[in-house]
């Protein structure tokens, strides 16, 4: 809805307050609970402050201070995302497939346009994990899995990285990331 700066402490406080995460690909914040005038649009993973409830709507405050109403079914509490006990790979695969057909945009990280690392970071965000922004950063976390010709070592939800191996004259260069979804198939944004 709007760009705003947050300190580390403010980000930690998100789970202590009534903040919600938008869980649909697209949506709207309405000026009133009658859904007659649009304040702004929403995309998957937008974080908004919940200030009240009216029937089937949440009253919300946007980062820039504007207020409005959002349908309750489109919002989950931040705590429900970040207090998960395990990674649900079935949910990762299901959500990954909802991005089929979304336009590629270098640096994109929304359901309107997305790049490879924006794609993987959104999928893992909904599992309560915050990945670094770029593929070259994401590869530094997790556990290395040996590759073979038929992908039998991979599990659904594994991140697959692409690039150039290190040589004597140049370092390794990671330039792309995707997610393994099973049966020898991976999904990515390109």
Task: Identify the function of each model-found stretch.
Residues 1-23, 53-54, 58-95, 102:
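Boundary regions of SH3-family modules and the immediately adjacent low-complexity/disordered segments
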Residues 104-111, 132-135:
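Surface-exposed patches in mature extracellular/periplasmic domains of secreted proteins
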Residues 100-104, 123, 127-131, 164:
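Sec/Tat-exported extracytoplasmic proteins
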Residues 3-7, 12, 17-20, 76-82, ...:
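Aromatic- and glycine-rich peptidoglycan recognition patches
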Residues 15, 21-52, 104:
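Beta-loop motif signature
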Residues 131-190:
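...with weaker cross-activation on analogous glycine-rich loops/strands in unrelated enzymes
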Residues 15-29, 125-140:
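Short, basic/aromatic beta-hairpin or loop at an interaction surface
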Residues 96, 108-127:
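Active-site nucleophilic cysteine motif
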């Amino acid at each position: 809805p709007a760009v705003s700066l947050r300190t580390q402490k403010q980000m930690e406080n998100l789970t202590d307050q009534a903040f919600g995460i938008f869980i649909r690909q697209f949506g709207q914040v309405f000026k009133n609970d009658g859904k007659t005038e649009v304040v702004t649009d929403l995309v998957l993973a937008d974080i908004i402050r919940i200030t009240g409830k009216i029937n089937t709507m949440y009253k919300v405050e946007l980062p820039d201070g504007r207020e409005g109403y959002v349908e309750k079914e489109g919002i989950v509490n931040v705590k429900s995302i970040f207090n998960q006990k395990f990674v649900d790979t079935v949910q990762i695969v299901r959500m990954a497939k909802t991005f089929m057909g979304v336009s590629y945009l270098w640096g994109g990280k929304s359901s309107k346009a997305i790049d490879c690392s924006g794609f993987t970071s959104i999928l893992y965000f909904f599992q309560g994990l915050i990945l670094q922004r770029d593929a070259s950063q994401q590869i530094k976390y997790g556990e290395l899995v040996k590759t073979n010709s038929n992908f039998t070592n991979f599990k659904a939800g594994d991140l697959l990285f692409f690039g150039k191996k290190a040589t004597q004259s140049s370092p390794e260069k990671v330039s792309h990331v995707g997610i393994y979804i099973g049966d020898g198939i991976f999904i990515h944004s390109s």
